[in-house]
Design a protein with these regions (language model features):
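Conserved beta-strand segments of alpha/beta enzyme cores
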Residues: 30, 66-68, 126
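Generic structural signal for small/hydrophobic residues in well-ordered secondary structure
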Residues: 6-7, 41, 80, 105
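Acidic, PIN/NYN-like endoribonuclease modules and their adjacent C-terminal/linker elements
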Residues: 1, 102, 106-131
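A generic structural signal for short hydrophobic patches within well-formed alpha-helices
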Residues: 10, 38-41, 119-120
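Hydrophobic/aromatic residues within well-ordered alpha-helical segments
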Residues: 37, 54, 61, 76-79
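Short, hinge-like loop/turn segments at secondary-structure boundaries
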Residues: 48-52, 87-88, 129-131
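Active-site neighborhoods of divalent-metal-dependent phosphate/nucleic-acid chemistry enzymes
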Residues: 68-113
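Short, well-structured N-terminal submotif of metal-dependent ribonuclease cores
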Residues: 1-34, 43-60
Length: 131
C-alpha cells in the first residue's frame, strides 16, 4: 500500500501508538507525506514548547523510513478542483487543508491513513479511517 499520512497519523506514530506503528510496518510499501501535512506539523512544533525535539524526531522519521513528499503542483491543484467541486455540489464541507491532503493522495494514487471521519465524504480517494 502507498500510505499517504494525515497529520494525526504522524502524531500517533511519533507517540508510539501501536495500531499505527503496526499498520505502517506491515501494510505499507511506501510512505508519503503531503506538503500540507508538513505545514500542519511544523505549525504544531512551533506552537509547542519542544520545537527542536519535535523537528529532530520528524527528520529522523523521514530519513529512517525513506518518506516521500508530495508537493503541490498543477497536477495536485487539478485534483483539488475535482474534489472541492464534488464536495460543493453535494453541499459538503470539510476543512480546506483536508481537501488539499485528499488532492495530494489522489494525485499519487495512494491510500490515505487518517482518524478524521469527514474523509468518508471524499469518494475520489482510497482511505483507511482508524478509530
Amino acid at each position: 500500500m502507498r500510505a499517504v499520512l494525515d497529520t494525526n497519523i504522524y502524531v500517533d506514530f511519533a507517540s508510539g501508538k501501536l495500531d499505527v506503528v503496526n499498520l505502517l510496518a506491515i501494510q505499507s510499501t511506501e510512505i508519503l507525506l503531503p506538503a500540507i501535512v508538513m505545514g500542519e506539523l511544523f505549525y504544531g512544533f512551533i506552537k509547542g514548547s519542544r520545537t527542536r525535539y519535535n523537528e529532530e524526531k520528524f527528520h529522523h522519521f523521514v530519513s529512517t523510513l525513506d518518506v516521500y513528499f508530495i508537493h503541490v503542483n498543477e497536477h495536485v491543484a487539478r485534483k483539488y478542483a475535482i474534489i472541492f467541486s464534488a464536495l460543493t455540489n453535494n453541499g459538503t464541507r470539510i476543512p480546506i487543508n483536508d481537501v488539499w491532503i485528499a488532492a495530494c493522495c489522489m494525485s499519487v494514487g495512494g491510500t490515505l491513513l487518517t482518524r478524521d471521519r469527514h474523509f468518508e465524504q471524499v469518494s475520489q480517494i482510497d482511505k483507511i479511517i482508524l478509530p
